[in-house]
Regions:
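Hydrophobic (often cysteine-bearing) scaffold residues that line and stabilize catalytic clefts
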Residues: 3-4, 48, 52, 250-254, ...
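A glycine-rich dinucleotide-binding beta-alpha-beta segment and adjacent secondary-structure elements
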Residues: 21, 34-39, 68, 74-79, ...
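A short acidic-Thr-Gly-centered motif at the start of a beta-strand
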Residues: 57-61, 91-98, 289, 295-305
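Glycine-rich loop(s) and the adjacent beta-strand/alpha-helix scaffold that form part
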Residues: 62, 71, 75-83, 88-160, ...
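A conserved FAD-binding loop/helix module that cradles the flavin
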Residues: 319-341
């Protein structure tokens, strides 16, 4: 889009190095439905190449793959020795069911995967399934994130789909702070309605639309650091979260440096909103990967150190959060686990 090309040139003149984002978007399929942005919106069609449109649809084409929907997995059962999972127990339509298999992969997300394994405690695994290290549920991480609006009152933003560029000039440790600050990427186009709903004070719709017409939304991400006391727990059947924020000094430095870049690039009005603990930004870390069974939950192939046929294939296994979207890394680790299974690991 011409407007985005102009923003890119302005950023380059301001001294940063914007690059194109990797996108799993079929733009033609998306825009066929409606001329709307896609960032933060689900899509029931095929415009957004999410897990369902991509790998799940391909997997379901195989005759030996099936999907059970509306099922709430309550626990995994093991043999008497606790070395192998023999069944997953789930509830569907008010009834309890069991499904047996040779191997089990847990991929419910950093909170729910940890909770499932903690609920699956037994005589052989009193602290939770696969938790001899006492690391299960610990080291919960959730990115430090801020939304930034850069507004140019003299130039309209005509983009429909704008989440296409990012810059990492402040990511590496070669700055005056001595440690990484994070990633900056465009948000999807902020509409007047979105802006009106998120403004800290009430504002008329016309004012929100006017602001949105001249605004570019940016998403700033910094690492959350692993802390054993940031954890997911299960008490009386309920999930309990205890998250201790970290690395906010780096995030505040990222905000300051990015604000300076935007102003240098010709955006005199820069507004920011740092998200709190209610915002789930790439949760990870609760079943960390590692070579040492005493300090990690799964091995380098995402297999449980304690249970030979149990794998965890979601962001739970990430030992650090980095400061970028984790989906491609999670996919790569799942492929690595699949390769290990096919080798008979």
């Amino acid at each position: 889009a011409p407007a985005l090309a102009a923003v890119r040139r302005r950023l380059e003149k301001a001294g940063v190095h914007p690059a194109s984002l990797p996108l799993s978007i079929d733009i033609e399929a998306w825009l066929k439905r409606a001329k709307t942005g896609w960032d933060a919106f689900p899509n029931t069609g095929t415009g957004k190449i999410d897990a369902e449109v991509g790998p799940l649809a391909s997997a379901l084409a195989h005759p030996n793959v099936s999907l059970v929907t509306g099922a709430d997995v309550t626990r995994l059962e093991t043999d008497a020795a606790g070395r192998r999972v023999i069944a997953a127990v789930y509830r569907k339509d008010g009834a309890e069911h069991r499904i047996s298999a040779g191997r089990f992969a847990v991929a419910a997300g950093a909170v729910q995967s940890a909770a499932l394994l903690l609920r699956s405690s037994s005589t052989a695994h009193p602290a939770g399934l696969g938790n001899s290290s006492d690391q299960l549920g610990r080291n919960f991480m959730n990115h430090n994130t801020t939304a930034m609006l850069a507004i140019d009152p003299f130039a309209a933003n005509s983009c429909v789909y704008q989440k296409t560029i990012a810059f990492n000039d402040f990511y590496n440790a070669d700055n005056e702070y001595g440690f990484p600050l994070g990633n900056v990427q465009l948000l999807g186009h902020i509409t007047g309605n979105i802006l009106k709903a998120n403004l800290p004070v009430p504002a008329p719709a016309w004012f929100a639309r006017l602001m949105a017409r001249h605004a570019y939304g940016w998403f700033l991400t910094s690492e959350d650091l692993p802390n054993p006391e940031s954890r997911v727990m299960v008490r009386d059947g309920r999930i309990v979260m205890h998250w201790i924020r970290s690395n906010m000094r780096a995030h505040e430095a990222l905000i300051g440096k990015t604000r300076a870049v935007m102003r240098k690039a010709g955006f005199p009005i820069v507004l920011t909103h740092t998200f709190g603990r209610k915002t789930t930004s790439h949760q990870c870390g609760t079943a960390r990967l590692g070579a040492d069974p005493q300090t990690s939950v799964v091995d380098l192939d995402c297999r449980s150190h304690d249970v030979e046929n149990l794998y965890v294939t979601d962001a739970s296994v990430l030992p650090t959060s980095a400061a970028v979207n984790p989906a491609l890394t999670v996919a790569a680790l799942a492929i690595k686990a699949g390769a290990a299974i096919s080798r008979g690991h």
